[in-house]
Amino acid sequence: MSVVLHISDTHFGTEQPRVVEALVALAAQQRPDVVVLSGDITQRARPAQFRAAKAFVDRLGAPVVAVPGNHDIALFDLWARLTRPYARYARAFGSDLEPVHAAPDLLVVGVNTTRAWRHKHGEVSAEQIDRVASLLTAASAQQLRVVVVHQPAAVTRAEDHVNLLRGHQAALRAWSAAGADLVLGGHIHLPYTLAQHGLARRLWVVQAGTAVSSRIRLEAPNSVNILRWGEASGARDDPARTGTEAGASCLIEQWDFARHEHAFVRTAVTAVDPERA
């Protein structure tokens, strides 16, 4: 079984130390195989904020697949924004803005949806859509196929439509046809799992809240997701289940920070059955 810790919008510079420590403790307890960090790692893309973020992820004890968010490009330093927008990010997290993590039962594909000429809105190009689709097509049936973006590919509330990833419809159509199971994102600090219908095959958009920042929504505390993929993850012996090889399932767990307990606690579990031919 593979365990993925999905965190987002850490916004270092606004982090809460006790929440940071609670998340480090959760990672030590759950021992993820990989950590996915879906952007807005810093608040203002300052070198000290990137250093603090890197020190934090180094404590999580697993390989990290990170993509930048709009906050990870300098906002007020226009020269840096226009000439070397990702230089500070690269010093901390490497120059590969679209990393790929491949294991026998897991494929994670990062997509850089930020643009230096945009303030906060994200987009995915036709070239990026095709690159991801090619990687998905080559994946094995045993692999959970995960795409990571920053801005959401689907939303649950009308007020969040303005934050939708530009090009999301074309991306979801192509990635579904190519075999994607999950599209992970952040940006709006609101956690949810949303099934996508009317596509070539089943696909779920999985959003994470803000992991450790004080910039929380009133209705959404600090939260992260834990994904469990494999036969053992479901613990469900239902002979009527169809559409998966050997009953493989994926559990998507939402873990919220409980202030009275000073710890992350599991608050929701969504079981999904990725389709396999």
Regions found by a protein language model. Give the residues of each.
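Active-site neighborhood of phospho(di)ester-bond hydrolases with catalytic His/Asp-centered motifs
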Residues: 6-8, 35-40, 64-70, 112, ...
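N-terminal active-site segment of His-dependent metallophosphoesterases
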Residues: 1-59, 75-76, 131, 137
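Active-site environment of divalent metal-dependent phosphoester hydrolases
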Residues: 13-15, 43-48, 70-81, 115-120, ...
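Short acidic, glycine-rich surface-loop motifs adjacent to enzyme active sites
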Residues: 141-156
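Conserved beta-sheet core of the metallophosphoesterase superfamily
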Residues: 160-241
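Extended active-site neighborhood of metal-dependent phosphoesterases/phosphodiesterases
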Residues: 51-131, 174-176, 199, 226
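Beta-strand-turn-beta hairpins that frame and shape the catalytic cleft
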Residues: 1-5, 99-110, 140-144, 198-204
